[in-house]
């Protein structure tokens, strides 16, 4: 949103901000969504936005491979998003190793799976706002963030005036309310608009009184970064009771995850 038509500038922000909490595929998810947002400002072709945005991702990565599969399955089953969804589930949706909650259970928030659900909605939604968010929601898993991304990208492409009236009517109720005690929708929009104008000028474009000229950027792949390489689950142990003194845990491997709750005098966290 801050870098309209400037994919590589958007990816640079993702590099610095995304690496605070993610790396590898987790980082690429942000890069890809940012690239599609950036392209949505300058193109009305959703397939172009999906495929051109993918050029910001290194071809050797799992994320690139998964998105490429979805694009190819869309070509193979152009009228059946559920068939494409089944293919995603069979090949990519089986096991989450990045989030401990998803190991060996039917729960998967791997970034490439959620990226697949975003472009599933975009490709099969065919420019229809409600259809797009419906498909990304029904795909499952992280089903609030994914339709927010697919709907946001498509909404950027369409522009505010082309959004369905029933959604715009409801926005008026909440657009000045701070979200989780941070900023409101209107304030966030104002900040993003100002940042975008600054970015356009910084990257060689021009900002006039009634128009802007953007120095369009062709996507350049981000550096290759492989997350959780060679990592697999060896053992999962459940201790279904309270432990007053946590014991020493010995293991052979490269890491361990300990999950539980801390019980205090007045609360559990």
Where would I find each of the regions flagged by the language model?
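Primarily interfacial, aromatic-capped hydrophobic alpha-helices that serve as membrane anchors
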Residues: 173-237
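A broadly tuned preference for mixed-charge, low-complexity surface segments
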Residues: 47-61, 163-179, 202-210
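Long, charge-rich low-complexity segments
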Residues: 41, 78-88, 165-168, 191-210
